[in-house]
């Protein structure tokens, strides 16, 4: 959608679950969004960037949120692959 100035504006952009790729609805109050900080490998300090993951309520309800976050962190090389 464009406004009068020709800029693209969206009123609502739905979030998607990072683990299951489902759309997180507005009434899904059990869903979470977590930011995991990226750290410098030498100093161990926060470098100003982070990865954002959204987990829907259905994944949390099944008790799979921790496994899903670990899998996502391994895929993004935040956690080592041999854990």
Swiss-Prot record:
Cell compartments where the protein resides: Cytoplasm, Cytosol; Cytoplasm; Rough endoplasmic reticulum
Q: Which GO molecular-function terms appear in the entry?
A: structural constituent of ribosome
Keyword Cell wall biogenesis/degradation assigned: no
GO biological process, any: cytoplasmic translation
Give me the Gene Ontology terms describing cellular component.
Answer: cytosolic small ribosomal subunit; rough endoplasmic reticulum
Sorted alphabetically, which keywords does the UniProt record give? Cytoplasm, Endoplasmic reticulum, Ribonucleoprotein, Ribosomal protein
Family named by the database record: Belongs to the eukaryotic ribosomal protein eS21 family.
**Role, per record:** Component of the small ribosomal subunit. The ribosome is a large ribonucleoprotein complex responsible for the synthesis of proteins in the cell.
Q: How does it assemble?
A: Component of the 40S small ribosomal subunit.
Q: What protein name applies here?
A: Small ribosomal subunit protein eS21
- Origin organism is Ictalurus punctatus
